[in-house]
Amino acid sequence: MTINDLLKRIDDYAAVIRAYRPLSEAEVKELDAYYRIGMTYSSNALEGNSLTLSETKVLLEDGITVGGKPIRDCYETTGHARAYDHMLTIARSDSLSISENVIRRLHYLFYNGIDPEAAGEYRKGQVFITGTAYVPPAAEEVPECMITFVTELAEKRGKLHPVELAAYAHRRLVDIHPFQDGNGRTARLLMNLILINQGYCIVSIPPVLRYDYIVALQQAQREKAPSDEAFVKLIAECEIEAQKDYCRMFRIELPKP
């Protein structure tokens, strides 16, 4: 399917979901908790966190850590959940404006338990992304790159389909790699901030798609003939799966493709 085909299906499904809304307060609370666990698990697992979905659930719901697991993995889990909660709050604002402070706050909440001094702060040195020839900007270039990024994000809003905009925000933040660590998780939170604000479902990229996810990012970052088509398609396909999951939970019948 082409990107346009995928976006049309997304909008068809979104119309069905909108017709079912609004949810009750209890349903919203249940849904938020469901995605809080699922997104925290999947986003961390993409980065090598060893906690399983069940272990993530026990830690977040009961505060019980699993013996033998690295303490950092536990901090990543609780930190991501805090950042997720904040992301939801601002995503539901009618006057959302994505600024550097918004992005830095997401990173701060995720990373503060791991390294308080680096949380929410732009990196001071060069970073490298394993498995790719792409090299992120030098540390001294990061502030200017971020200013340009948030400006472009505002300019593209209304011109791109919300799913394309969310994919762009995700991919571009990973390109810049503004923080010492935690860039991927911050990028996925930013992506979902845009999706939720525009009435779409939360996207969790399952660990089983890690290879496809990395390859799609690499295609967008390559020096010769870069293309973000595969990455946008991947995010669009994940959005469709999220919509199907949403409809399954609420027994909503979707139109046949």
PLM region descriptions:
Residues 1-257:
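FIC/Doc superfamily catalytic core
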